[in-house]
């Protein structure tokens, strides 16, 4: 085996996916791996780079398709991808990079605000060596939260926002509201 593999970090909004992605990439940096992170360029909530909801910042390339950054990442051995659910080529890209010996770490929502699979992100599960599903805290009853609930009536899937537009909720609070 060439050492390449895929690590998938999934969960609802506010579960710490981006924070965990940054932690893992930093861990490889400490071990002297050449690392790069990629963020979805339409996510400009906090400015350039990769941002967590608690305003931690990490340098990142920006793209709407991962194939657009292939040339820029050839010299890196660890690739971190934030908001993986928004990249239409996430599955093919991750499989190709892992097969080329690269470590690929993806942070992504597993479900939409309607609790449906988010694009093709779940197709990465059988291709991943490691899958972690994080939970958040329900913003209504403070129990474990596995779901993202959108505030408002907008039905479009790709609406990028933070605490102003979404809540993490448990099953009961999702159903009750």
Swiss-Prot record:
Signal peptide: none
Family statement: Belongs to the thymidine kinase family.
Organism domain of life: Viruses
Residue positions binding Zn(2+): 138, 141, 170, 173
Outcome, altering residue 90 to V: In strain: Bangladesh-1975
Subunit structure: Homotetramer. Two molecules of substrate bind to each enzyme tetramer.
Keyword Repeat listed: no
EC class of the enzyme, as a word: transferase
A Gene Ontology BP annotation from the UniProt entry: DNA biosynthetic process
Function per UniProt: Phosphorylates thymidine and thymidine analogs, such as azidothymidine (AZT). Part of the salvage pathway for pyrimidine deoxyribonucleotide synthesis.
EC number: 2.7.1.21
Reactions listed under catalytic activity: thymidine + ATP = dTMP + ADP + H(+)
Protein name: Thymidine kinase
Active site location: 83
Binding positions (substrate): 113, 157-161
GO molecular function: ATP binding; metal ion binding; thymidine kinase activity
Residues bound to ATP: 11-18
Keywords: ATP-binding, Disulfide bond, DNA synthesis, Kinase, Metal-binding, Nucleotide-binding, Transferase, Zinc
InterPro entries: P-loop_NTPase, Thymidine_kinase, Thymidine_kinase_CS
One Pfam family linked to the record: TK
Family annotation (Gene3D superfamilies): 3.30.60.20, P-loop containing nucleotide triphosphate hydrolases (3.40.50.300)
């Amino acid at each position: 085996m060439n050492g390449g593999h895929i690590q998938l970090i999934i969960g609802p909004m506010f579960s710490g996916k981006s924070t965990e992605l940054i932690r893992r990439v930093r861990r490889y940096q400490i071990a002297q791996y050449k690392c790069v992170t990629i963020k979805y360029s339409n996510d400009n909530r906090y400015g350039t780079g990769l941002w967590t909801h608690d305003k931690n910042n990490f340098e990142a390339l920006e793209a709407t398709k991962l194939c657009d950054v292939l040339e820029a990442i050839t010299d890196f051995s660890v690739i971190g991808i934030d908001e993986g659910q928004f990249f239409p080529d996430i599955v093919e890209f991750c499989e190709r990079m892992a097969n080329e010996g690269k470590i690929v770490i993806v942070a992504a929502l597993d479900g939409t605000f309607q609790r449906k699979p988010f694009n093709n992100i779940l197709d990465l599960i059988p291709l991943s060596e490691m899958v972690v599903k994080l939970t958040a805290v329900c913003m209504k009853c403070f129990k474990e939260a596995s779901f993202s609930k959108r505030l408002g009536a907008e039905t479009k899937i790709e609406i990028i926002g933070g605490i102003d537009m979404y809540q993490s909720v448990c099953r009961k609070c999702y159903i009750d509201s």
